[in-house]
Every structure is written in C-alpha cells, then in structure tokens.
Amino acid sequence: YVSATAGTKLSVPLITSADINAPHKQVTIQEIYDFMIKDVKEAIEQGLPEQSRTVIHPNLGAAYAFLARVYLQMANYEEALKYADMALEQNDTLYDWISYYNSHKEAITKEDSYPSLPSATGYDYVENYYFRCGEGNPNYATSELNIPVERAESFEGGDARFLSRWKLRTVNQDTYYQGLAKGYFNGAGLTTCEVYLIKAECLARQVTGNDFSAAMDVLNKVRKTRILPEIYQPLQASTLTEAIDLIRRTKDNELIFTIVPFADARRFNAEGTFARALSKTWEGQTYTLTPASHLWIMPFPAGAVQNPGNGTITQNVSK
C-alpha cells in the first residue's frame, strides 16, 4: 500500500457473490483496503462477541487486531495504535516461553536427542485472538518446519521460544536446525504478540525527539516472556532506525512462517528508509533480492489472465 498510487494501481478481483457466474471487477489497492476495513467494522457494529464460540470463530479482539494490522500496512499509525490498544483490552496475555523451556529443558538439551515436544501455539494458545493453521492441516497434527543455520542466527541469544522449537543437527553433509514441536500452529491467525509489536512500532513512529522508551517498554514486555532471565537485558533506542530495527527483529522471529514478515518487508521497502536487500549464497553463488525487485510481486497465473471468467484481470508485473 502506497497512498500516492493506491487509488490507481490495480489489486485483485473483488468477488462478493457466491454465484460462480457473477461478474467481478479488478479493483484498485485503495478499494480493496476500503472493502476490508468496511467489512470488519460492519461486523463489529453488528455485534461480534467478546468471546467467540471457538478460537476458529472471530471475536471482537480478532476484529480489532485485524484492523491494527491493516492500518499498519497503510502507514496509518494513529489508527493502528488505536485498534492495537482496543485489541489488548480484549486480551493482553503473553505466553511464558521461559516456563515452557524449563519444563522441557532436560529433553531439549540431551545430547544427540531430538525430542518431539507438544506445540504450545495450538488452538488453546493463550495469545490467540483467532486461530488458522496456515500451511498446516486443521485435521491432524503436523511437525515444526526445519530452518537453515543462517536463519537461526537472526534470533536473540537466550530466546527460550527458539530454544524450545529448534535444535542444531547435522545429518551427513547437511547442518540445520531441526524443528522439535509437533501439533497445531497458528500460522495464519492473530495473536497478542503481534499486536504488542504493532503497538511498539506505532509508538516509535510518533516520537518527535529521541525518547523511544514507551515503544521499547512494549517491546521489552514481549521479550521478558521469551528471553531467559540470566541473559535478558532491556533494549533501548535513541533513534527511529534503532527502534524499528529492534522491533522488526523480534517481529520477524515471532511471526516466522507467517505472511507478516513478508508484508512488513514490502511495506518497509516501499517506504524506502528501512528498505533491505536480502542475499543468500548457494553452492558458491550469491543471489540478492533488492528492495525494488519485481520478484517481490506475486504475478497472476497466466491462465487466470487469459481466462478470467466473467471479468478481466490485468497482469500486475511487466516481467
């Protein structure tokens, strides 16, 4: 979302009918954002309950959390902060990952042992506003995905959440961090941790001097439930760049395997100030994804463009 072009650049076809033959229109980015916001606000007005029937049914906290996420993507930090606070009024609980790690420490630290631990982030995860499995299957338990060594290096030292979920392993010529957890994973839902980190960024964005303590207090509140006490030190920032970097590190790691780090990266790239190039070396060759690369954009399948049904679809990339 870029406000200067949102009213003219096309997004996706907006389909509001269950009729397979209903006509559709490819709307602008502004129109699709307006539709999402209007839809959620209407649901709130119509009486979304504070407590939903199940965690896979949205409740009031989920609606507020979703609006906070959407407004953050629009760089509307005032509204994002407003709805983040409203979501936290519904649920502000953070999971104690330090206690989880300590409960399973013996199994985790046992040499040459890669135990199957119960996922803490399933349907009953206390941070859930709304649960969706993401890449997992809602009908049966799945295993935590492995991560490469270079990805693991971005986690803070002493991160109990990381230590509880991955363990370094070498098999033949491959060294990687093996996923330990098995169960259900809220990979596409909404959680209190994300909302705290949205709030932290919004508070940082509103600073006019160099006092980022309010934003750092929110970030550190999350970290206190993650970083082992013998290693934990409160983070401080004296510039917006420092604050954003610290918040982004925690958020990228907390929401690994979700769409959020990707969406945030595109948002920061569009803004320019906090844009990053991503590089990876594979078999002696270094590949770099620049902030302006067309590869950040997911093109429509050729079949959809050529046969769009009862409407038209304009391709969103030129390459």
List where the protein language model places each region.
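Short, glycine- and charge-enriched coil/turn segments that flank and shape catalytic ligand pockets
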Residues: 208-209, 236-238
